[in-house]
Amino acid sequence: MAEKVLVTGGAGYIGSHTVLELLEAGYLPVVIDNFHNAFRGGGSLPESLRRVQELTGRSVEFEEMDILDQGALQRLFKKHSFMAVIHFAGLKAVGESVQKPLDYYRVNLTGTIQLLEIMKAHGVKNLVFSSSATVYGNPQYLPLDEAHPTGGCTNPYGKSKFFIEEMIRDLCQADKTWNAVLLRYFNPTGAHASGCIGEDPQGIPNNLMPYVSQVAIGRREALNVFGNDYDTEDGTGVRDYIHVVDLAKGHIAALRKLKEQCGCRIYNLGTGTGYSVLQMVQAMEKASGKKIPYKVVARREGDVAACYANPSLAHEELGWTAALGLDRMCEDLWRWQKQNPSGFGTQA
């Protein structure tokens, strides 16, 4: 009997790619999403998941639901017997979190507390949580390993991820029957090789690569580069970009780990290589054959100069390594953008 996995926020960018990998690995994903950051499409399914069904030839069970809706969550857990929960649902824009801290704390913290309480009540004590490298704050050393201090976060989004990590750690400490894998993502980019699913930000992209690809396709005039006076090789910010398919596969490895009764484990998911903004622009120009105009503007509050992972622990304990490099990330991102110039709203 295939094992059921609840995926919260599963219609979003990382969620939809993970649902695809779950199906390929033989799991039965049940997806909930409130469409805050997902495209509705015409049918009963979010467009991203409709396409996942097409790609895999398997059906996806989906319910429109907000994790703040306690009654709906209760009904869901009564209806299904879940082996584990992969928890993506949450607000995720750094800049917006500075403007709207209460929204971020309400959705991310209250939503997660409710989810954990309902999991506990139904005896579902296996969790994969999508955390973030933002929990490290300003790096004290590089590359960042899991032992690097956390909590010196520069914005409410990062703080909310840090607080949730602490809650889950405390829960696993108090009750040894809980197992949790906390995955600290670095900077996901790229898209599925088919070009059928990818990142489709609602509104102006907050992240570099979707913005760059929208400039390349002509949706936006020029890229703003936030600061070129950082202490890096070319003065622009350096980040660890990871292919979203590699990231999604990390969640399958995390589910396997849960079966070992692992307690609470924490892993970086990154490549271990940092690239600057200008290196990413050049790589995207190469992949797309387009010139990408940019202008340098003031630094963005809360941005750090450089941030990249030491991913060796995930390799040792999860058997997971990022396999897809920079050129592949950009080629796949460009294929998605070219086939879907308006994102999921593009009519075939």
From Swiss-Prot:
Gene3D superfamilies, per the entry: NAD(P)-binding Rossmann-like Domain, UDP-galactose 4-epimerase, domain 1
- Give the UniProt keywords, A-Z: Carbohydrate metabolism, Galactose metabolism, Isomerase, NAD
Asked if the Swiss-Prot or TrEMBL record annotates the protein with the keyword Isomerase, the reply is yes
Q: Which residues are the active-site ones?
A: Y157 (proton acceptor)
Q: Which residues bind substrate?
A: 132-134, 185-187, 206-208, 224-226, 239, 300-303
Keyword NAD: yes or no? Answer: yes
User: Which domain of life does this protein belong to?
Assistant: Eukaryota
InterPro entries assigned to the protein according to its UniProt record, in alphabetical order: NAD(P)-bd_dom, NAD(P)-bd_dom_sf, UDP_G4E
Could you state one GO biological process linked to this protein? galactose catabolic process via UDP-galactose, Leloir pathway
Tell me which GO cellular component terms the UniProt record holds. cytosol
- Reaction equation(s) it catalyzes: UDP-alpha-D-glucose = UDP-alpha-D-galactose; UDP-N-acetyl-alpha-D-glucosamine = UDP-N-acetyl-alpha-D-galactosamine
Function summary:
Catalyzes two distinct but analogous reactions: the reversible epimerization of UDP-glucose to UDP-galactose and the reversible epimerization of UDP-N-acetylglucosamine to UDP-N-acetylgalactosamine. The reaction with UDP-Gal plays a critical role in the Leloir pathway of galactose catabolism in which galactose is converted to the glycolytic intermediate glucose 6-phosphate. It contributes to the catabolism of dietary galactose and enables the endogenous biosynthesis of both UDP-Gal and UDP-GalNAc when exogenous sources are limited.
List the protein's name.
UDP-glucose 4-epimerase
Q: What is the lineage of its organism?
A: Eukaryota, Metazoa, Chordata, Craniata, Vertebrata
